[in-house]
């Protein structure tokens, strides 16, 4: 029975005397055993290290047997070793998630009794904070019931009263928690206590305990060590400590304060128990840190923190410590990877002998693995990965959301997209079945894709999913004016809907009907199996194993195991309680989100990446400490516990020597120099301290004060680590290259710089490129280098390919041709490649326009059919007629969207009001005008299965024709004694004016084409040849009127519905357009006015809207030529990226859905807008009238 302290600074190899003592103890007696106790996070590495060093010391065959009597454990593993067959381990120990359930249950039951913490159960993280405080108090050997009497006296000040009330709540919660936990098993803190009690009854005289890697212990761990010192044959305690503290505590500002305090505590415990204390062994011979510079850094840091005289830097060699400042985070990691690769290739290091330390893994994680992969460096990131990103967690969250929000479509799609809901026959895990499963999964995935499109297009939510009736829907193409075949879509989307409807409603009902937690857990478990979740995870695991992704396979297995454990613990805690579905959902969502995967390195020879706080002296031969900025080193520490620093200090002042709470925030901040000391001593041969000068969005990031102090006090250079430039010499350039894959990136950057600077590459780089092109990676390099000369210019399609794409004859509409002139690539994408955006539920502009057109068409057809004159109807008759039309249209399946929600019902009302207002205006217009409507919705050309009057058929250069189709909304006729005139009316749901420039450039071909067709087929339309009246727009809307307008309401309203467009400058026509006009008046219907001399003429500033017959003829001829020009370019394979730009408006790109396809970027010199020159009417007419036939199809 004895205890001995093994001391030394980080330079000393404290493990050497421990291994020697272990060997000696094992050799003394065949019954002797050794338990090596280390922190859990280094147990794996320490076990390998201890066994290796022990093997090196053994010299005979018999000696090698001694290692079987050596165990490397953590304290909790030691508890399992001794207590596994005792009642303490006979019951299942609840996990942290199970303990959180008990806390939740207590908080709900005791809510009315709580004062400070009432209602805190709904605060995110509160239960975790509560559990952490409980564990802290148990580990600190503190019974809360003992504290409360003292705290009752702390009522002199408000803070004392708050602390008393807080502990009143905590006493209630923790007392009930302990009572409940006694029914289920012992939590970890209790296990240590029971181990201490158990070991007092065990003969440990043949056992030596070696304790290493700790600097401080919890109160219960100290009690356990006290038992070990009293019972064991020998106890060795290794502490990173510069001197002994047998009688006095160290100065709180000391670098080794924590270790010194631990030394003092253990020394005093041994003295009190009269346990022999052997002389300290201070290691001075065996050196852990072998590089003299790093030894000097160790001494410097101790002296600077202990305020001792500074060191001399005269003997500094400069081969062990390197300070880097990188241009940014990416360059920092790139240079680290390059240096690692160099160390391995040139200096013989192994990857496992190198570690990367950081305190900001969130910043580096996304870049680290890809960059290291480029450099072909195997890496292991020692970080617990949360389960919250696993599809199973998403599946559970979306399942609960479906119930909470009644089949909201985004929740249903989230649920389906996890691909865990796949009800199918259970498959065996054989190679054949994996192929079968993949085929089934792909088929299911396709059905889900189709279902998603259907749901987005039709807005299926709520009862649409739970009803037994299958979905029935129509799909109407408003442009082509035809109904699409949706039989396959209906069948496949309904297959998905039926699967959900068969399982989900009954599951939710069963859960709601469950009486107890056990009953609900049983329902949930069976639903997991019925849904195919267990099978899917099993197949995912098998698929990952087949692909060699062992970590992914383990994650799938661990996630399922975690869910099953959570379910078991839920039954343990809530099994006999009344079931509450809301609590059940909260427990399982938060329970899985808080869990982490346990990780094991998948390969031995890997670079280790870990947190700075978890390192230890001499952990690796080479250490890269990255991200050494002032933001995180020293770390800014906040108190996020339930007790403030002041409250902690108050409590600590009342505790006995064997009780304590963890230190305050100030104490943790004071420990930061010690963390830095561990980082600086973590490397045995080389240490690299690096930081980025730019991080995220922060510019001019400052280095850590520790970094600056080392650089200044030791007079060390800071090496700049930047991107390669074309001006770098060969030595500097070589520092950027470690593999052929990285060479591709460097050469790409340099070639781009050469292009920008016109500087030549060094011969060194040309030789490197030549060597690269002889490697297997050459095809990738070639592809990347080609990107430097790539221009975002679409290739012209061969005419042989264009014909099967578009046909020999082109059947088109006016809007399609206008699209071609807006941007040829847009036309190619939509009508060549047939790309189309997914339909999204709602009333589209096309559907709105179709609604208005259909309503007005039926309105006039009823008038014509009933041989009624609109001008003769009363307002009431007009209103009744409009109502009849609306009732007919709103029952049409094309507009069923208008009945799907309250919002849509309101839109329906607004559309109806608009039609009624327009009907009112049409009546007033008919009373004032000589124009009468003779036909509506006049088809020309072939539209779907319908064939109308003759459309335009124009010749193309390939001997084919371009066939133009369309639908004229309305044709009006005006008959005078001298002539018959035809005019076309086009309804627009937005305000539109005829623009001569747009017509000239092919951007507005509709009105000229419609008028051309009407005149061409006049005999068929009105029974005789007719003269043109014009093409006019009618704005279909429900106008807002000015309250203070000088005109009366009717005049204001008619002004809002005034026709706008192109009119003939024909006196006979103008005299009869508005029969209500009087001298010195402007028409409310047309852009005309009557002069004082009773002469009808174009209105003020309206001249550009009027043309003569020769001018109209030129416009119509030019319009036809634009069709021919576009048709010839289309069949010729022209695909230019030339979006039109007029004035300050990007008319082609503004609403274009293909921007992500064409990648048009005005910053690229090869991408330019087709800028539309604004021309006056006179300029256009001069060009058209003076143009000879040879240039008739050319654009200026």
From Swiss-Prot:
Cofactor(s) listed: Mg(2+); [4Fe-4S] cluster
The keyword Ligase is assigned to this record: no
EC number: 3.1.-.-
InterPro entries: ADDB_N (IPR049035), DNA_helicase_suRexB (IPR014141), P-loop_NTPase (IPR027417), PDDEXK-like_dom_sf (IPR011604), PDDEXK_AddAB-type (IPR038726)
Cofactor stoichiometry and binding remark: Binds 1 [4Fe-4S] cluster.
Similarity comment: Belongs to the helicase family. AddB/RexB type 2 subfamily.
Reported function: The heterodimer acts as both an ATP-dependent DNA helicase and an ATP-dependent, dual-direction single-stranded exonuclease. Recognizes the chi site generating a DNA molecule suitable for the initiation of homologous recombination. This subunit has 5' -> 3' nuclease activity but not helicase activity.
Protein name in UniProt: ATP-dependent helicase/deoxyribonuclease subunit B
Gene name as annotated: rexB
